[in-house]
Amino acid sequence: MEQYNVTGMSCAACSARVEKAVKKVPGVTSCSVSLLTNSMGVEGTASPAAILSAVQEAGYGASPKNASASKASDASADLDALADRETPKLKRRLIASLGFLLVLMYFSMGHMMWGWPLPHWFDGNHVAMGLVQLLLAGIVMVINQKFFINGFKGLIHGAPNMDTLVALGSMASFVWSTYALFAMTRAQVDGSDELVMHYMMEFYFESAAMILTLITVGKMLEARSKGKTTDALKSLMKLAPKTATLVRDGAEVTVAIADVQKGDVFVVRPGENIPVDGVVLEGTSAVNESALTGESIPVDKAVGDKVSAATTNQSGFLRCEATRVGEDTTLAQIIKMVSDAAATKAPIAKIADTVSGFFVPAVISIAVVTTIVWLLLGHELGYALARGISVLVISCPCALGLATPVAIMVGNGLGAKNGILFKTAASLEAAGRTQIVALDKTGTITEGAPRVTDLLPAEGVTETELLTLAAALESRSEHLLAKAVLADAEAKALTSPEVTDFAALPGNGLAAKLDGMDIYAGNAAFIQTRLTLPAALAQQAEKLAAEGKTPLFFGGAGRLLGVIAVADTIKEDSPEAIRQLQNMGIRVVMLTGDNQRTADAIGRQAGVDEVIAGVLPDGKETVIRQLQASGKVAMVGDGINDAPALTRADTGIAIGAGTDVAIDAADVVLMNSKLSDVPAAIRLSRATLRNIHENLFWAFIYNIIGIPLAAGLFIPFGLTLNPMFGAAAMSLSSFCVVSNALRLNLFDLHSTRHDHKTASPAAAPVQSAAENNKKSDAEAPEVKTEDNPMKKTLKVEGMMCGHCEARVKKALEALPEVDEAVVRHEAGTAIVTLNAEVADDVLKNAVEAQDYKVTDIQ
């Protein structure tokens, strides 16, 4: 996506105009314009010259963003681009405007209303009073000429905007007041004191100046608040190191960060920031990675561990090799991700975009009609104009245009601070609508690396003897489980002796000689070919297997020496994270390639709602497809084989420590690799959506109430609106919307206080996917295996509570072909386990006899 800076935009109508103009350029496939960041993202084959020309023809300015702006080495340039230059300019304009406005108000209202003294030469000189007011109002208009330049330019190009409304309102007040001044002068020449007083009451010079000043107040507050929405992005950019200490020819040399190349060796002392991504060659230390992950607890680093740019070396001296530099560093990628997300639009923004396209022309039409109607009702032109001007200046398309992007920007920034990165505005919106979360087991629910959990030595054998022998035998094996045994022996500082005649045997077994004694290891089936298992150990091993652990049997000299259990253990925060998801009304499904028995054990420990076992790597995408029939699905994974499922899901969530392929395929990236960040991400999305709805509500309600009030519809009830108060209301509307969005910065992502509570069904194994992996996508999703003859899923409407579930369950299980029915009113599903074929109509009739409606059977 090519990025451009856009100038001259003042409201949502402007951004809609630019977007519409660029989309008409041949070769442009998509265009997204951000009023908040005054930027534009364009995809397609169109040339930059054609795009810039289209923007200029629409009446705005544009320039390509520096291609290197996303590089960490040029973070200072990017930071400079985000600097708030608008607020100081508006502040200077406001101070100047206020100075002249106060003098104008003194002349126009102070003497008449409060008897404030005036220079004696103004006594009875009404023309002089009028000329002073004209001059002062004219000066305020010159100070705020930008409203007139942008407003009338937009009107000429057929794209009126907020500035057009302000310019028309202020100009109408000024022109009418100027006419009244000339008419009053003529009346004074003619000696008609009554007409002189009449026309003096028609002066609206103070309104012309007050409108501009109040709108400038609102613009300044809005600009200041908008500047705060990019604080998170600016703080990320400030983290980018400026220099690095390289080792060249045996000497340390300090160079600019832009000069660091991949493969360079750099050193980092305690207290220094790591300059680029790299791998530790020498030294140990604790590194604070909170800048990237939001996690304040330091992470221990040793030789071979990866380090990231902008993290802080806290304790030891590190010598590292650069692996990612410039725009490839983790920090640069995070900055780019947050920036790109700000340049995209959420689907919900289409509401405001649609309204903004016709809002300003509609307001101008309403103002004209209002003026004409009051004239036809017999009121004077000045009175009718006041009503029309009030309509112009109270209407605010800005609030509509800012309702969505400011909330998206703040939400994205808050997520980035906590190590949760949303790639687009659409993904931030979609995450909050999640109804089902599918979790890959390995590396997501579990640690992803097996470790020894139990040591069961046989009678007469110690744990140390068993582990020493096991390590000696497994030291020659490349199996993943062997590494777990070796790691446990190393952690206990055991030294394993050398073995000879090592062999990996068919049937998952190992054999070797240790000091002339035959030793062997393997699963239960293999070990029973060599010896007889003691009943007690066999029973214990069976219990371990039921818990999802893998028992490894070790023997020697014809007798069993013991059993070592190995398992991929559940992450400490996984059960709590899953419980939080369930309390948010989300169904949690675990996907795994393990056998059903192991999968069920892990599922029970984790507390998931459903377990789908036997899923081959290429079958995850099919499972996600099936789950989508029940609702919006978020897939959480970390491996290459998760990429198709992450892409297929409504929201793909990648664990940050996973593969680059998985991260590329995902919509959301969790830098912390903690499952507890999944409910936090959904919580943040829901809070952002709530904030957007609040903003849109107030923006619409403000205009729905304000425009009729300004037009005079409530005058019969004693309610009227002066143009000055209309301008004040308009100036505050955008400020209120932006301020409401900034409240998101106070939101606690990990607090469960506002979670929607719901009864969470107990963990239950659902189906084996062993056969399902072989099916094509077009086939029905019933799954048949030896243990699970057939399952069907019914979509049921009308269930509201646990009693409804019980009625449907009882009706289905009364059928002789149904062994079990798992019914959930939250998901609106009934999953039946069958022992024989049964027609769909039979199942449907059984449910509908209980006054519920079956909409689909799969």
List the predicted regions and their residue ranges:
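Flexible metal-binding regulatory segments at protein termini and peripheral loops
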Residues: M1-A128, K153, K226, S235, ...
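Hydrophobic alpha-helical transmembrane segments
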Residues: G138-F147, G154-H157, M171, E194, ...
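P-type ATPase nucleotide-binding
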Residues: V452, L456-M584, Q596, V608-I624
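Juxtamembrane coupling segments of multi-pass membrane pumps/enzymes
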Residues: M184-Q188, E194, A209-P270, K301, ...
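Membrane-embedded alpha-helical bundles of multi-pass transporters
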Residues: M113-V127, I156, V175, L414, ...
